[in-house]
Structure formats: structure tokens, C-alpha cells
Amino acid sequence: GLRRTYQSSLLFRDLSARDNLFLAVRGVSRGRFSFLRPGAASTTRAAADELLERVHLTGVADQPVAALAHGQQRQLEIGMALAGAPRLILFDEPAAGLSPAERTDLVQLFEALPAHIGFVLIEHDLEIALRVVERVTVLHNGRLLKEGTPAEIEGDAEVQAIYMGEGHRERHGS
């Protein structure tokens, strides 16, 4: 299946992180009334707890989402997108509003995604995108500017001038 995250978080803010994941797992479970089966709730809870571990949120599992840091909310969204073992996930600007430390955590989550899950990343932070994707399509003013590998894009003078600025060139020697 296909899952997605949103640029603006869509979470149940009054519920706990665990409950949000429980609902995500429940929402992709087979069978309209499968929750009536004996043991279904415990299986769903176990799957939610596994997702909490996967996105490094076990320590805040029972806190309301509203009390979580912005980066933790992004991690929770990724966990919810992973519910039901999708084949493809669309990430819409997952780094928006994250601190440098939260961006590092986000990159680690992307790097830990199972190889069988493909993803499309829409991201304004080109440095993050270049670290986690295999192919890059760069748009400028709604038009295709360049396509290529992260190395090709990072080495492109036009992309650097538009999106990365001189500071990037000085830091990375390109």
C-alpha cells in the first residue's frame, strides 16, 4: 500500500503517542470488524509498541501528543505511516520546523527504513534530501531544473547557486 505524512502534522493531539499508533495500526488492519476477534486488541497494541520502538518514542509513549516536541511529533507521524507495512511512503517536508538535532534524528529514521519500503521525499532542505535518497529531482519556479544522483546534484553549480548558497560550496569544497 501507499502511506503519506503531511507538511503540517495530522495527529490526535489529546491522545498519547501509543494511542495514535494503536489507531494507525487499527486503521490498516484487515477485516471491518476484526477488533471484535479475541486477542485483536493485544495484537494491535503489540504492533503499536513495535512502532514506538522503531521511531524511538518508547520513553514518551504515554504522553499526550500535544506535550511532545515538534521533532517527536514528526517521528510519530513516520511511525503511523509505517503501520501496515506499506510499499511506498510519501513524505511531505518532514524536516520543516525541526531543530538541527531533530534533523539528525530524522535522517537516522530515514536511514533505518527497511529496504523494501520505497519513499518519495518532498523537501526544501536539500542537504537532508541528498543524504537519504538515491535519485533527486530538483524543481525551480515549478519547472524541472536537474535530475540525478545526490553526488551529481550536489556538484551542480546551478543547483548550488539557487538552493545551497555559497556557504555550502565553501563547507563542501564544490
Tell what function each PLM region has.
Residues 2-174:
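Glycine-rich phosphate-binding loops of nucleotide-dependent enzymes
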